[in-house]
């Protein structure tokens, strides 16, 4: 699962693999499964403006690659002490090829 965040100036930040970037749930947690709350945390550069859009994408791998996402909450930080932007995106849709909107 990857995440691309955008600001209103056209800048973006890309996390190509959420789990390896900052999965906090432990080595035996089954990420992206029904009923689970998955939490990720990592550091990166802040965008020029607040996060205003995001693109969450599945690579379609795995036996049961479909995943229903309720929401994505993002806090952009350059350090543990300085937060640049926080936003919550309501998603409420499947990321799957076999359920509407049939997109990963």
Swiss-Prot record:
SUPFAM superfamilies: Lipase/lipooxygenase domain (PLAT/LH2 domain). Residues 1-104 form the PLAT domain. InterPro entries: PLAT/LH2_dom (IPR001024), PLAT/LH2_dom_sf (IPR036392). Pfam families: PLAT (PF01477). Signal peptide: none annotated. This is PLAT domain-containing protein 3.
């Amino acid at each position: 699962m990857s995440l691309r965040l955008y600001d209103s100036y056209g800048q973006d930040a890309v996390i190509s693999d959420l789990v390896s970037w900052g999965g906090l749930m432990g080595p035996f947690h089954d990420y992206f499964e029904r009923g689970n709350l998955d939490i990720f945390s990592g550091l990166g550069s802040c965008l020029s403006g607040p996060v205003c859009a995001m693109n969450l994408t599945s690579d379609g791998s795995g036996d049961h690659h479909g995943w229903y996402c309720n929401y994505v909450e993002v806090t952009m930080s350059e350090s543990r002490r300085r937060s640049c932007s926080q936003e919550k995106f309501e998603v409420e849709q499947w990321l799957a090829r076999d359920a509407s909107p049939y997109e990963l």
